[in-house]
């Protein structure tokens, strides 16, 4: 499966992702980041709340399609 970041700047095979992390940063936004090498992390998506970020991260790991696109937030900013 290929994972596409929310802004479509990154496309990586899920097999290269060592782990993902959801953390609050970036002016209160919640970031979903993927570690693809021991010293390289990629921001996959930004969400206004932790729930959306955790849901998107979980859905990526459960996806059985050829591609996973991180959804845009449904919450108004």
Language model features with spans:
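Eukaryotic intrinsically disordered, low-complexity regulatory linkers and tails enriched in Ser/Thr/Pro
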Residues: 1-77
């Amino acid at each position: 499966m290929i994972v596409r970041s929310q802004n479509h700047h990154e496309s990586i095979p899920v097999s290269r992702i060592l782990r993902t992390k959801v953390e609050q940063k970036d002016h209160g936004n919640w970031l979903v980041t993927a570690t693809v090498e021991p010293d390289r992390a990629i921001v996959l998506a930004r969400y206004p709340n932790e729930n959306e970020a955790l849901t998107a991260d979980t859905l990526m790991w459960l996806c059985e399609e050829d591609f996973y696109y991180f959804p845009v937030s449904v919450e108004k900013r």
